[in-house]
Amino acid sequence: MKNLIYILIVALGFASCNSMPNQAANNSGTANKERVKQFYDQVINAHNPDMVDSFCTADFVDHNPDMGHSGKGTDDLKASFKEFFAAYPDVHMTTNFMVAEGDKVVSHITITGTNSGPMGNMPATGKSMNVDGIDIVGGIKDGKASERWGLFDAMKMMTQMGMMPPPGAPPAPPAEPMKTDEKKK
């Protein structure tokens, strides 16, 4: 009986020691998810690109930058957001769910907004979008991220903006062949 009690005490001791790193990792993951959610709320939903420096390191890298942007540094990120907010002044991001592992947070997001301003050399369409995406924020240390990857349903967005026909629409007629002057003299 003494041996059984001793074995149980030792086993419980090992079990509690083993759970401490996991608890610390869970706390870190929870803190990182909260920080990314704050970024979405305070930068994107508040349309406030000036808050970027509070959430990103100076050497931040966006691995999927918008056209015309390098994806390097917070100044480039702020410029990208300013252009995006001008094109979609009512843009809103909803976080559907988040998963954290180590220094990374993966978010399934939905972005809505109306294209009422130009974006680069593309004129405003006046049409609304409602698209899903995956956003991965990484290198989170001391509450600041150093990199990001993002994917969204670009085909759905282009269809909603009128830049592509909807799925199942008849194909466009073939282009007329170029006419050339065969009687060159």
Describe the function of each predicted region.
Residues 1-4:
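Positively charged n-region of N-terminal signal peptides that target proteins for export
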